[in-house]
Regions:
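Membrane-interfacial amphipathic/re-entrant helices at transmembrane-helix boundaries
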Residues: 1-22, 35, 49, 56-62
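Alpha-helical transmembrane segments within multi-pass membrane transporters and channels
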Residues: 58-103
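Conserved small/polar residues in nucleotide/adenosyl-binding loops
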Residues: 163-169
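Short, non-helical or kinked segments that cap or interrupt transmembrane helices
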Residues: 30-46, 83-96
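Transmembrane helix-loop junction
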Residues: 27-31, 51, 55, 79, ...
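Interfacial loop-to-helix junctions that mark the boundaries of transmembrane helices
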Residues: 6-10, 147-158
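Extracellular/periplasmic helix-loop junction at the C-terminal end of a transmembrane helix
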Residues: 101-147
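Alpha-helical transmembrane segments in multi-pass membrane proteins
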Residues: 14, 18-22, 42, 46, ...
Length: 170
C-alpha cells in the first residue's frame, strides 16, 4: 500500500514536468499579451524531433537541441501569422496544433513504421538519473527511507529539479 502510493507520487513528479513547463510558458505568453493555445503542438513537435534526433545521433543532448529548435520554429510561425500578418492568434495556435499532430503521425509512420511511435533509445543514450548520497542505505528506514529512495532520489536532474526550482518564478 505505502510503496504503491510512493510509486504514484514518483510517476506524478516525472510526468508533471512537461505539463508544468508548458503551463509556465503559457503564463509568460499571457503576461506579454499573446494568446498561445499552440503549446500542445509545440510540445508534440518538440517531443517527436527530440526522439528522432536522439535516435539518429544516439545522444539525448542532440535530441534536446532539436526540440529547442523546433519549438523556436513553431513559435516564429505563430509570431509571423499573428504579429506580422495580423492574423487571429487563436486560429494560428489551432493551425500549429493540427499541423504538429498530422506531421508527427505521418513522419513517424513513414520513417519508423511503428504506428507513429519512435524507437526506444538504449539506456546509454538517455539522460542519466541522479542517485542522491545514501539512497540505498536509507532505504531500510521505515517511511522516510522509502520517500528518500523512491520519491526524491533517482530522478533526472535536468527535468524535475529545473521545473520545481523555476516554478516559483512564475
Amino acid at each position: 500500500m505505502w510503496s504503491d502510493l510512493l510509486l504514484i507520487l514518483d510517476a506524478t513528479l516525472r510526468m508533471a514536468v512537461p505539463l508544468v513547463l508548458a503551463a509556465m510558458g503559457g503564463v509568460f505568453a499571457e503576461r506579454s499579451g499573446v494568446i498561445d493555445f499552440g503549446l500542445e503542438g509545440k510540445m508534440l513537435g518538440g517531443a517527436f524531433v527530440a526522439a528522432t534526433v536522439a535516435h539518429l545521433t544516439q545522444s539525448a543532448w542532440m535530441g534536446l537541441l532539436g526540440a529547442i529548435i523546433i519549438g523556436i520554429t513553431f513559435s516564429m510561425m505563430h509570431a509571423f501569422a499573428s504579429v506580422t500578418k495580423q492574423g487571429n492568434q487563436v486560429v494560428s495556435c489551432v493551425a500549429i496544433n493540427i499541423f504538429a499532430m498530422g506531421l508527427t503521425t505521418v513522419l513517424g509512420q513513414a520513417w519508423f513504421q511503428r504506428g507513429g511511435k519512435t524507437p526506444q533509445l538504449p539506456p546509454e543514450a538517455r539522460f542519466t538519473t541522479i542517485e542522491l548520497p545514501f539512497a540505498e542505505e536509507l532505504r531500510v528506514v521505515p517511511v522516510l527511507g522509502d520517500i528518500y529512495y523512491e520519491l526524491i532520489s533517482g530522478h533526472n536532474i535536468l527535468a524535475v529539479s529545473y521545473t520545481h526550482l523555476t516554478l516559483p518564478t512564475t
